[in-house]
Amino acid sequence: MRYDGGRSPARSISVVELIATGTLDAELAGLLWLLVEARLPMIVAAAAPRTGKSTLLEALLAFLPAGTRRQELSGFAEDFVWLPEAAELGWQGGRDADDRLRDRPATAERVTRADPASTYLVAPELSDHLPTYTWGEQARVAVRAASRGYGLGATIHADSLGEVFALLGGPEVGLTAEELSRLGLVLVLRLVPGGGRRLAAGHYVRPVVRDAGGHIQRLGPAVLATWDPVRDALDHFWWGILPELAERTSRRAGDFEAEQARRASYLAGLVAGGLTGWQEVVAAIAGYRASDPAGAR
């Protein structure tokens, strides 16, 4: 399906409402807007149930550009028939995509091949708890797809970046360190006293790259922001890797910084104006892009 601002469930919570309730702030949301718009992979992690992982993921997916194909994974039943690179990415489902497409029942929904330049994979949860969740070989192929340019949004039960790495790098999924470096954004969500939710830490996982001589260059993950429980506020550190983040959006560092500030201010204005409804926020995001096409890529 083409992305039109979200699934619109009965009670969707917008990113502006999450800012208003303190889950994250406008500065981090403005940064994530730029990075999600560039289709960076994004994992939302939380250890406790009902913390709001899916709520945060869906709210941030509203930042995907118009025309993005959102490809929901089908859990244990996922066959990647729509993914041309599936076999190259290690899918052991047997034959190539042409054979699998040809053998689908005539009554099956028409399958359109995915294009990495415009497709964002979505896994409601990375785990083996339910058949609708994504785990094992399916999870491995989905993360590997990020190396081919596909976006990926998912949630996972984990309380830290280290736990995310341990789960996805463990024997059941079996991702290598280089493959884990494609996770992009890892956002850790926690419950706080009183029943609130806070984005406790935001990480940018730097992809392994090779220099001109073919040598592997590994840089550790960078912290974008962390929550200070004393002040009940986020401390921001993303400016320390500003050039790297700007490069992911094909912008110069100065342009990226200015655009992040504009978007953060815009979101703060929506909070101040009480514009928090899902459809209102989706329309406001579209309106921002329409009024400033140079700032929305």
What is the predicted role of each segment?
Residues 1-41:
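P-loop NTP-binding catalytic core
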Residues 19, 152-155, 272:
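Generic amphipathic alpha-helical segments used as scaffolds and interaction surfaces in large
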Residues 30, 58, 181, 209-214:
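Short alpha-helical basic/polar micro-motif
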Residues 39-49, 57-191:
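Switch/coupling sub-region of P-loop NTPases
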Residues 185-271:
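Conserved P-loop NTPase
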Residues 259-297:
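Terminal-proximal interaction/regulatory segments of ATP-powered molecular machines
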